[in-house]
Amino acid sequence: MSFRDPVPLAQALIRCPSVTPEDAGALDVLAGALEELGFACHHIRSATGGPEIRNLYARLGTEAPNLCFAGHTDVVPPGKGWTVEPFAAGIDQGRLFGRGSADMKGAIACFVAAVARLLEDGAPKGSLSLLITGDEEGPAVDGTVKVLDWLAARGERIDCCIVGEPTNPRKLGDMMKIGRRGSLNCRLTVFGTQGHSAYPHLADNPIPRLLDILRRLTEAPLDEGTPHFQASTLALTTVDVGNPATNVIPAEARAGFNIRFNDLHSGASLERWIRDTVAQAGGEVEIKVEVSGESFLTPPGALSDALAEAAFEVTGLRPELSTSGGTSDARFIKNHCPVVEFGLVGQTMHKSDEHVSVADMEALTEIYRRVLVRLAAPS
């Protein structure tokens, strides 16, 4: 297999049906390719969150700076509606099909190909590494965080990182991510007293109090945004009383909502606001809050500049520096080093007939190679 061409490696990875938490041999395929290029590969296993998860850390070189590429080989289930086999990795009309082609086995293969091309000119300056997890699409408790802990215990550090998520909405070169909004989920349960709907004065209906709480939470914007972040949002995701009867006032009323928040807030500050707002409505209310990630921003600098210039040279487009979208494993890496996200076009990720353009794969390989030349060119 020629590693300077990203397509064969991408096909080999896609043919491993690595639906979270299964690895299905994907990391062995990747490690084999990296070992042929001279990388030292380490397999890190963890099972604190359930089934054992396999992760891979591979490094070429021992000196600083250490430029890392982070990604994942696990994929979401294929689901229904495919017109091709989801793990066959077939090519049709210049498009590589398969679950994980966009998110994100294609980008992993592109980075490996970029490294292979760089090595044709000699050993890189400093070190190159790959941090690849099998637990990004799942709970994300046994993946990237565990590898970062393992690195810290060894005294190894990453100096900057590219995450190969499919950041481009329409065309390669559209967008890179320099941060992400945080995400908070809240479940409210308002307690009352059940009773007959003909005698409401003998019951304590929790529904009006729940509606009052939701009105208080949603009546004003959380903020107006910042130069790099859109305004924070609160989206109601469920309202439920679990009451099929038409003549019974329920004893409980429940609601759930999700907040996507910018760097004007933290999970802790939003939880305080929620609890203070709920308290104003009175009554007995249970509040459960889960923060799956804090907001973060990597200010524009050497890494984003190198990526933007490389993308412009290859595609003619200057990527928008964005913080939109959901969370990614960059939320863990940002505690260790500057991190940006840039990969293939994400229009079909998680959809049936997921695919990427073979031409885009060649272009992304060249973008990554030019970034490596700027930041890690052989002396």
Swiss-Prot record:
Copy out the cofactor comment.
Binds 2 Zn(2+) or Co(2+) ions per subunit.
Keywords of the record, alphabetical order, are: Amino-acid biosynthesis, Cobalt, Diaminopimelate biosynthesis, Hydrolase, Lysine biosynthesis, Metal-binding, Zinc
- Annotated residues that bind Zn(2+) 1 are located at 72, 103, 165
- Pathway(s) this gene product operates in, as recorded in its UniProt entry: Amino-acid biosynthesis; L-lysine biosynthesis via DAP pathway; LL-2,6-diaminopimelate from (S)-tetrahydrodipicolinate (succinylase route): step 3/3
Q: Which GO terms describe its biological process?
A: diaminopimelate biosynthetic process; L-arginine biosynthetic process; lysine biosynthetic process via diaminopimelate
Q: What is its EC number?
A: 3.5.1.18
Q: GO MF annotations for this entry?
A: acetylornithine deacetylase activity; cobalt ion binding; succinyl-diaminopimelate desuccinylase activity; zinc ion binding
Q: Which domain of life is it from?
A: Bacteria
Active-site residues (renumbered): 74, 136 (proton acceptor)
Task: State the Gene3D superfamilies in the record.
Answer: Zn peptidases (3.40.630.10)
Q: Which residues bind Zn(2+) 2?
A: 103, 137, 350
Q: Which Pfam families match?
A: M20_dimer (PF07687), Peptidase_M20 (PF01546)
Keyword Metal-binding assigned: yes
Instruction: Give the catalysed reaction(s), semicolon-separated.
Output: N-succinyl-(2S,6S)-2,6-diaminopimelate + H2O = (2S,6S)-2,6-diaminopimelate + succinate
Cofactor(s) recorded for this entry are: Zn(2+); Co(2+)
The record's annotation in InterPro entries points to: Bact_exopeptidase_dim_dom, DapE_proteobac, Peptidase_M20, Peptidase_M20_dimer, Peptidase_M20A
Q: Which HAMAP family match?
A: DapE
* Protein role: Catalyzes the hydrolysis of N-succinyl-L,L-diaminopimelic acid (SDAP), forming succinate and LL-2,6-diaminopimelate (DAP), an intermediate involved in the bacterial biosynthesis of lysine and meso-diaminopimelic acid, an essential component of bacterial cell walls.
Q: How does it assemble?
A: Homodimer.
Family, as annotated: Belongs to the peptidase M20A family. DapE subfamily.
This chain belongs to which protein, by name? Succinyl-diaminopimelate desuccinylase
Which gene holds the coding sequence for this protein?
Answer: dapE
